[in-house]
Amino acid sequence: MAAMNNMNPMWVPEGYESPLNIRETEVAIKCVKDFFEKELARQLNLTRVSAPFFVYPESGLNDTLNGVERPVHFGVKEQGDREVEIVHSLAKWKRFALKRYGFKHGEGLYADMYAIRRDEDTDHLHSILVDQWDWERIIYKEERNEETLRNIVKKVYKALKNTEKYMAIQYEYIEELLPSEISFMTTQELLDMYPDLTPKEREREIVREKGAVFLMKIGGALGSGEIHDGRAPDYDDWELNGDILVYYPLLDTAFELSSMGIRVDEEALTHQLEVRGCPERKDLMFHKALLNGELPYTIGGGIGQARICMFYLRKAHIGEVIASVWPDKVAETLEGRGVHLL
């Protein structure tokens, strides 16, 4: 099958036709989400909590992503037009919530997170509207190591694997694609294997071979001086994080289902802020609390709801499982090629 053309958002696999119409797709989306949410909570000992849709900029709680994406913001009338920002993710908010809500070691929370990423370049896998399960769990400081990370990754992967088994029972056309176990590899090891390829090309090559990979150590500079992918400096520890990538044969591409990691401690936060050239963030509320030792040590991540629905339902475009907006020409062309956007 031809590889997905990342330069052409209107490309559709030849002969593609989803077995489900729009109404059947909506039912199947609920089926996926209900099962996976319970399975994730069971594997990681998580309690569902309500999530904010916007936060105050000065709190430092919003996710700055790669540092260039502009948050959507507006003024609140009753507060004299005090500005709030729609969240990009709940990566930092969750650590505050764990402390405030009285969670203990080995316990965690998850929330349904909705975000607007206005500067996203949309394609088959990316939309302006983002929905994900944001989760976070308390660990001891001495558990901030690769062994802990690997153990939690295996639990998340088990939830993903069990969900695929469940959906294969519910729908005859769904066959199991995920391997029984996930492989682990660092970004430096991947660069050494494929030094002449781009980061995204490297990811595709390794998941073609392995089926499912947890790609570790994302955000810091590699031996070549390049960064595999951008990460904000103030939630993941770049030495103890990664992405769950799986192979998606319909699009012949690496498919990111989750980004997760052990969160920064005082030392990692200070170092990473210096590397990114933004030490002034230490004066924000979140960063002050962390540096003062007031927040728990945690591991956490985000799992794309539309992403896993697209993957399990074997859809060609994320717009088939999330109601977002698309350029007129893209929407019209996709509709004419059998891709029915919500």
Predicted features, each with a name:
Residues 2-126, 134-138:
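Class II aminoacyl-tRNA synthetase-like tRNA-binding/catalytic domains
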Residues 27, 31, 35, 147-151, ...:
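Generic recognition of stable, solvent-exposed alpha-helical segments in well-folded globular domains
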Residues 40-47, 156-167, 316:
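A generic secondary-structure signal for well-formed alpha-helical elements
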Residues 58-63, 177-185, 327:
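N-terminal pre-domains immediately preceding structured catalytic cores
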Residues 74-77, 99-105, 125-127, 175, ...:
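A general structural signal for short secondary-structure junctions and capping/turn motifs
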Residues 111-197, 201:
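Extended, charged alpha-beta segments that form solvent-exposed binding/catalytic grooves
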Residues 114-116, 187-342:
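A translation/RNA-centric and nucleic-acid-associated enzymatic feature enriched
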